[in-house]
Structure formats: C-alpha cells, structure tokens
Amino acid sequence: MGPGERAGGGGDAGKGNAAGGGGGGRSATTAGSRAVSALCLLLSVGSAAACLLLGVQAAALQGRVAALEEERELLRRAGPPGALDAWAEPHLERLLREKLDGLAKIRTAREAPSECVCPPGPPGRRGKPGRRGDPGPPGQSGRDGYPGPLGLDGKPGLPGPKGEKGAPGDFGPRGDQGQDGAAGPPGPPGPPGARGPPGDTGKDGPRGAQGPAGPKGEPGQDGEMGPKGPPGPKGEPGVPGKKGDDGTPSQPGPPGPKGEPGSMGPRGENGVDGAPGPKGEPGHRGTDGAAGPRGAPGLKGEQGDTVVIDYDGRILDALKGPPGPQGPPGPPGIPGAKGELGLPGAPGIDGEKGPKGQKGDPGEPGPAGLKGEAGEMGLSGLPGADGLKGEKGESASDSLQESLAQLIVEPGPPGPPGPPGPMGLQGIQGPKGLDGAKGEKGASGERGPSGLPGPVGPPGLIGLPGTKGEKGRPGEPGLDGFPGPRGEKGDRSERGEKGERGVPGRKGVKGQKGEPGPPGLDQPCPVGPDGLPVPGCWHK
C-alpha cells in the first residue's frame, strides 16, 4: 500500500471520527427523548391502572352496602325475637346432626366368657371396616354468636306529601276608625241644566282660567339636509396602542416575478467553515522512503504452536513479518466544484404592529333617517296665569239688548277647585261586619327543597350465622408494579483465578498451493518435508 493510499485512509479515518462525534451527540439526544417518552407512557399507564382499581373498589363497596341493606330489611320483616328463635332452632339441629353423622363410631368392648381357660391363640388378621352407623342424637344448641357491627346509616326518606290547607283563623278584633283622608280631586262637570229664561245682559265677567293643553301634535317632517360644514380642527395624536398578539402565519404567496440584478453589496464578514468537501481522488504513489535504523531486539515470544504447516517451498511467506503501522495521512484533495443553488427558505415571521396613524378628516354627514313613530299623548300642562282685566265696553242700545236677550246663553266652564275643608269629627264605631264567604282553594305550591337527613336509626338485630361460602376463584394476576429505584453500584469483586489451559484445536484445512518462489542461490539448500531448508544448510 503506497503513501497516497495511506493518506486517503487517514483522511477517511478523520472524517469517520468527526461523523462519529456528531452521531454520538444525536444518539444521546435521541436516547434522552426516548427516555422521556417512556416515562410519560409509564405514568399514563399507572394513572389508568389506579383509576381502574378505584372503580373496582367502589363497585365492590356499593355491592356490600346493598347486601347490608337487604339483610337489614330482612331482619326488620322477620318480626319479634321469639319468631326468630323458632326459625333458627331447626336449622341449628340440622347442622349439628350433619356434623355428628361424620364422627367415627366407637365399638364397645364385649366381655369374654369365664369358662375358657385356653391360652390365647395367635393374633388374627385385621378385620374389614364395619358399616356406617346410625346417626346419633342431636347435640346441644350452640351459644349465641357475637353481636355484629353497627349497620350503616340509612338513606334519607322520600319527602312526604304536601299537607292539606289549614282552616282559616278567627277574625281579629275590629280596629279603630281611621282618620278622614285628604280631600279628593274635583269631580267631573255635571250635565248642562235646562234652558232658563233670558236674563238681563250682565256685566262682562272676569276672564276664565286657561283651558287644559291640547294633545301633542304629530312630529313634523324631517328637514332637508343642511350644507356641509367646514372641516373641524385636527385632533391630537392618540396614545399608541399596545402590541397586538402575533397573527397566525399565512400561507406563502405565489412566487413573484424575477427582479432585476441588484448592485454589488458590501463585502461580507468571514463566513463559517463549510462542511467537508467530497473525498478527493487518490494521489500519485510516492517514492519509497529510506530504510530506517535497525530496531532493538524484541522480547522473547511465546511458545508457538506445534502444528506443522506445509508451505510447499514458500520461503517468503514463512519469513514474512507482521503488518507495519499505519502510515501518515496524505495531502488534502482538490477542492470540489461549487454546489447548485439551494431551495428558497421558509417565509419570515410577521413583523410587529406599527404605531397608530393620525386621525383622518371627518366624514360626510349621513343620509336622513326614516320618520319616527308618533309619540304617546303628553300629560296636561299646568294652568296658565290669569289674564289682565279687560276694559269696560260701551253701553248698547235697546235694540241690541233685545237681540241679546233672545240669544241662548251657554254655561261657562267650571271654576278652579276650592281649598280643602276642615277635618270632620270622629264618627261613631259601626256594627261588626258579617263573616266573609270561604275563599276558593289555592293552587298547589311548588315542591319544597329536600328535607334534612333524619336521625340515626336504632342498631339492627344480631344477624344469623351465615353458611360457609364456596371457595372463591383465584384472582387474576395483578398489574406490573412501578419500576423500583436504581440500585447503588456494587463493590468491586475480587480477581478470579487463572483458568486452565484449553484443549488444542483441530488441525486446520490445507491451504491452496502457493506461488513459485524466487530463484535459488548458487548452492541451494535441500528442502525438508516441511518446505524449509534443512537445518545447518545456512551455516555452510
């Protein structure tokens, strides 16, 4: 391998190390994100499992409460304690009889006759088991069980029906007579009287009071629009508004037309080092270097294998040493060509909202509005002030008096109301009025709010001893628990003993036939069966 190739290998190694460093940073970031995702998933699974467990426990507790309510209802319907004892005695006798049936029967010993004085014979074989005996008499009734725990508080009862309407109460004593009220408003004018005889023409009476105001007239039509007024003075600049929220990014618009080439800009700052260019072509092979000084003799090597390798005359392969160290990196390659134009970047973020502009000119007046509806009739106005007294007229002639006597005199308008009169004396108390008729039944009111919970009920009776339940099914395996904390690092273990030497391996497969060796010396040494020169040949 030449120096150029070694240089190329060194460059690749340097790039590989740089890439490896970048890959290590990315792998660390990926591992951290995966750990956070796994932790979030574990927490969500744990919360779901906790909710499921709480739901199961709540359902079980509800079932137990329902069972206790049913037992309490049964005890309430059972009746007095005597009936409960009469019901429980036959059940207890039956249970005791079943227990006594299972007990083993003891056989009573029989007396041997006294006449036989023979020596006892050899022991006989064991007899067969006897038949099952009759059931024994029932045993005594057991003691009363321990009192059970207090029952849970009962649910509040349903609200009772609404009661009937109560009877009306007695009439109270008659109160004192009230004081006279204020004078009422003046009454309406009476009907006109009958036509009287024509009277003499009297003097002109005083001028009457002004009549009530007439009804409010309908609003007039809207006037025509006046001429446009002069523009008002310019307003003061307003306070700049607060910065608005960032708007939602809009979709990128269509690409605009290609602009004209711009002028050459100022020289930019030094750019950041670019990414490494593509791998250069391998350089030319350099000249062979000068031979270095001879190295120091190496340490004694380990004992070689005793396996005989047939080199078949390949002396160079037998004398070939280990591969040398890696050479220095080669010279840098030629810089690559300029790349193509990149893709357009993403649209920028919207800028901040600008300051508020100046106030604009006042707008033109709007068109006239529609005609409004007629308003309601207004209240009567206050009476007007009395007018001035008129001048006295001239005396009329006799003919004028006769003609005036024949005219119909119409009654004048009523005068103003007089002042209120003095308060009257207190009247005599009147007789007691009769009782009024009974009123109709009122409509039923709305349903009232729920009543307070009732007092705690008395403790329930002692429950009956329950029968032994069946063996429950094995529960389902529980969920996996949360992973425990990471344990501390253990102590360093002692160094193990040196292992025994392994068994020598099998003989390898015979290799391919080697290439022909170099030409021999003037006096070639004879070759042995292993392909090496005969010992002692090189010393001649």
From Swiss-Prot:
<keyword id="KW-0735">Signal-anchor</keyword>
<feature type="domain" description="Collagen-like 4">
    <location>
        <begin position="412"/>
        <end position="460"/>
    </location>
</feature>
<dbReference type="GO" id="GO:0030020">
    <property type="term" value="F:extracellular matrix structural constituent conferring tensile strength"/>
</dbReference>
<protein>
    <recommendedName>
        <fullName>Collagen alpha-1(XXIII) chain</fullName>
    </recommendedName>
</protein>
<feature type="compositionally biased region" description="Low complexity">
    <location>
        <begin position="168"/>
        <end position="183"/>
    </location>
</feature>
<keyword id="KW-0472">Membrane</keyword>
<dbReference type="GO" id="GO:0042802">
    <property type="term" value="F:identical protein binding"/>
</dbReference>
<feature type="region of interest" description="Disordered">
    <location>
        <begin position="316"/>
        <end position="540"/>
    </location>
</feature>
<dbReference type="GO" id="GO:0005615">
    <property type="term" value="C:extracellular space"/>
</dbReference>
<feature type="domain" description="Collagen-like 3">
    <location>
        <begin position="321"/>
        <end position="380"/>
    </location>
</feature>
<feature type="compositionally biased region" description="Pro residues">
    <location>
        <begin position="411"/>
        <end position="422"/>
    </location>
</feature>
<feature type="compositionally biased region" description="Low complexity">
    <location>
        <begin position="140"/>
        <end position="156"/>
    </location>
</feature>
<feature type="compositionally biased region" description="Pro residues">
    <location>
        <begin position="322"/>
        <end position="334"/>
    </location>
</feature>
<feature type="compositionally biased region" description="Basic and acidic residues">
    <location>
        <begin position="486"/>
        <end position="503"/>
    </location>
</feature>
<feature type="compositionally biased region" description="Pro residues">
    <location>
        <begin position="185"/>
        <end position="195"/>
    </location>
</feature>
<feature type="compositionally biased region" description="Gly residues">
    <location>
        <begin position="1"/>
        <end position="26"/>
    </location>
</feature>
<feature type="compositionally biased region" description="Basic and acidic residues">
    <location>
        <begin position="350"/>
        <end position="362"/>
    </location>
</feature>
<dbReference type="InterPro" id="IPR008160">
    <property type="entry name" value="Collagen"/>
</dbReference>
<dbReference type="GO" id="GO:0005886">
    <property type="term" value="C:plasma membrane"/>
</dbReference>
<dbReference type="InterPro" id="IPR050938">
    <property type="entry name" value="Collagen_Structural_Proteins"/>
</dbReference>
<feature type="topological domain" description="Cytoplasmic">
    <location>
        <begin position="1"/>
        <end position="34"/>
    </location>
</feature>
<feature type="transmembrane region" description="Helical; Signal-anchor for type II membrane protein">
    <location>
        <begin position="35"/>
        <end position="56"/>
    </location>
</feature>
<dbReference type="GO" id="GO:0009986">
    <property type="term" value="C:cell surface"/>
</dbReference>
<feature type="domain" description="Collagen-like 2">
    <location>
        <begin position="251"/>
        <end position="305"/>
    </location>
</feature>
<dbReference type="GO" id="GO:0005788">
    <property type="term" value="C:endoplasmic reticulum lumen"/>
</dbReference>
<keyword id="KW-0176">Collagen</keyword>
<keyword id="KW-1003">Cell membrane</keyword>
<dbReference type="Pfam" id="PF01391">
    <property type="entry name" value="Collagen"/>
</dbReference>
<feature type="topological domain" description="Extracellular">
    <location>
        <begin position="57"/>
        <end position="540"/>
    </location>
</feature>
<keyword id="KW-0812">Transmembrane</keyword>
<comment type="subunit">
    <text>Homotrimer.</text>
</comment>
<feature type="region of interest" description="Disordered">
    <location>
        <begin position="109"/>
        <end position="304"/>
    </location>
</feature>
<dbReference type="GO" id="GO:0008201">
    <property type="term" value="F:heparin binding"/>
</dbReference>
<keyword id="KW-0677">Repeat</keyword>
<dbReference type="GO" id="GO:0005581">
    <property type="term" value="C:collagen trimer"/>
</dbReference>
<feature type="compositionally biased region" description="Basic and acidic residues">
    <location>
        <begin position="435"/>
        <end position="444"/>
    </location>
</feature>
<dbReference type="GO" id="GO:0062023">
    <property type="term" value="C:collagen-containing extracellular matrix"/>
</dbReference>
<feature type="domain" description="Collagen-like 1">
    <location>
        <begin position="124"/>
        <end position="243"/>
    </location>
</feature>
<feature type="region of interest" description="Disordered">
    <location>
        <begin position="1"/>
        <end position="28"/>
    </location>
</feature>
<keyword id="KW-1133">Transmembrane helix</keyword>
<feature type="domain" description="Collagen-like 5">
    <location>
        <begin position="463"/>
        <end position="522"/>
    </location>
</feature>
